[in-house]
Amino acid sequence: MYKAIKYINANIAEKITLDEIAGICGYSKWHFCNLFRRFTGMSFTEYVSNQKMQLAAIDILDGDKVIEVATRYGYDSPGGFNKAFLSHFGCFPREFRKNSEEANVRYKERRDKMFKMSDRCKILRDDAVNIKSKNDEISYVHDILGPIGTPPNDSGESAEYKIACKLESIILKSRPYIQEGELIVGYNFADNSSKWDLNGIWFPIENTEECRGKMIAQGISAEDVDFFFKYRERVKWVRSELPEYTPCEKNMMEEGAVVGDCIFSDHNVLDYKSVLELGFEGLLRKVEKYEEITGENELYRAAKKICRAAMKLGEKFADEIAKMRLDQSLTAERANELEKMENACRQVPAKPARNLHEAVQSLWFAHILTTWEDGNVNANSLGRLDQIFYPYYKNDIENGTITKEEAFELISCLWIKLYRDYDVQQSVVGGCDSDGNCAVNELSYMMLDVTEQMDFIRCLSVRYGENSPKDFVRRALEVVGHLQKGVPFFFNDDVMIPSLVSAGIDIKDARDYTQLGCVETVIPGKSNPHAVSGRPNLLKAVEYALNDGKSMISDTLIEGVNQPKSTELDSYEKLRDVVFAHIKNILKITCEKIVLQTEICKIRKKPYKSLLTEGCIERAKDFNSYGAVYDYYQVMLFSVPNIADSLAAMKKLVYDEKKYTLDEIVYQLKNDYPDELIRLDFLNNAPKFGNDIDEVDSIAAEVIDFCCNCLEEFSEKLGRSFHAQPFSYLWLIEKGLNTGATPDGRHKGENVAYSVSPMQGRDFNGVTAVFNSICKLPTKRTPGTTSAIVEVDPKLFTDKNMDSFADMMMVFAKRGLSNVQFNVVDAETLKEAQKSPEKYQNLSVRVSGFSQKFHLLDKELQDHIIERTKHKCF
């Protein structure tokens, strides 16, 4: 049936007869009709009519004449077409077009009622997007690296205290730069020439001399620069103290089958809410309280120093604002703004926030300190901002101390600050509260409005479930459709909360989950998620199984699995069992390597993260020494769709139909398909994940279920908590380069599938079919979350169809859809953008768990995105 469905969709504009399609598939009409109905849930005639009508509707909306569309899709007369159209959509084509136009008008009327971006924000946005003042008045090298160029004397001081001293140095010595017109102050503008952290360990620097030159040019003395590099010359990790890897392990790591790391920083959401509620004065008292109970401790000593320094951050900016207020040429409006800003900075972050302005400012200061401790922004995220800010917003509105328009402007200013350092700094709106009640509020909607008005890439996620207001889901989808930048993306509470509870997270904490970075799940202020620590390419298991346990790239024998000769795998069950044995071995080695890396993690002290993570101060344990309430390791599961497609193809063409022998296929794979016809047979004539085909979808589900069982087993054996995370980030290109040809028709070196999305170009049965396939996966066992990107043609993602998309999201919330991201773009536009990037500077796409401007991507990623199916049908 896969072949039949694919043929129908490829030739939908032609007049396809039942005799023709049954003959192509080699069945009698009676047998074909029975199989087809069982497979699709509708008759052949109904299916063809449905597909034609959805495509015809797009053409009608494009302005094509009814008679032209009728002829295009094989109708003998406009009357017959009109009748079929009426039966499908409940109206005639012209009325359908009119309804769509009216839907567009209604949206425009609604948009006109939204708060508009203020003139101030237009200027600040333009400056941020065009990076006009990034390297002008301020410098990351001068203001961040400069102050810590001469760290305190190392003798006898603990790592925690040295880091606290360096963070204090940055706070006290960095300049209080305030951009003209801004309402929220403070900055963290990254210079991509260097990456560092306060442990004094350098990440790779592309050009050391260039970095030296920049520092000297910014006024740092040559002596300080020399000391800086002497102190921070590329320190080797403590890996030299770890056990030597075996030749087999080295090969598996080099080829990407096994990557066991331990992400120890820049991927988290801290307890910013406590900064707003207590201020650093209150946090200092908390540390002192536990110090009295537990006794003196280096973590407490460091945390107290950070609290005292952080209290001065607001004062520093308040003093600068006070100087600005002396300017006699200030307008009355700006003078009033500066007075409010000074008052806010006198209050926060030292003391609790009293209103929305102070809350936004306090959170921004706290976030800056997070990134300063880590030395880069990366995936440090902000959490559920609509929930954090709502009490302040509600109180201000009720007291009449702020207007909704002013609140809109404050959120806009925060969005611009975050865009300045665009990285995956995730924020989340919607969801439920700790008791499970709907938590959608006015700010949830306002933040969606701000995101649309800003018209730039802003990492924003929406939490929803079957009990969420449909209007909220619809509004989020409108932003996706009109912004066309892949945001926001959607996380289903009805899947995510049970999956977290299954991993030992308390139900109330699970209900407060948020996203960090791309799609990674975290309990804000309570967890160290070690995001994307395990990165195994499970497709290598298929390669090993079909090559006598050896890599097809290097011919290295893989240890840990005693398998028979590949030619002895004379049944599908034997092949599957060997593939699964290799998957388990890959996961085992990955988890073991993660555990080894945790020893390195322990020496990477994070006193600021510890201060804002529940459990650390209470237990007197550092964030990276298991201090957090929840300490777990997310293990990515690469290539699940490819494994399912490969095993389904082997089952059909080798074991069931016996069209090819194992020897033939192994030869083809080792030599990257010298016979193109055989490759096309495996590519086109075997079922593929993403088309709602049980025989292949069930294999994908079985693979993930098996992986979850393995990770639970290794969690118990190794004394760690490993969370399944079927997500691939950008590494789908890299993993593919190190993987041989596979039975799904994939060439050697070709990328693997993105997360749990179908392999590009293989899903052709509509958005509903993709969702159905994904919903068959055991998503409630993957607390790290799954990730799927669905490409939709802009002609389908219209205002008229928003209710249909919202209904679909609500229905699939019940069925188990975990995370979905939409790209609303057509392939033709992307191809044009690839040819003439200067004409498409603002064209953005969903790449992985993040969006990016298309022209900034390398050609491999551009090609991958172009090749993804752009769905035109539900």
Locations of the language-model features?
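Conserved catalytic cores of very large enzyme subunits
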Residues: 115-300, 333-340, 344-874
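Extended non-globular scaffold/tether segments
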Residues: 301-312
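Charged, low-complexity interaction regions
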Residues: 327-332
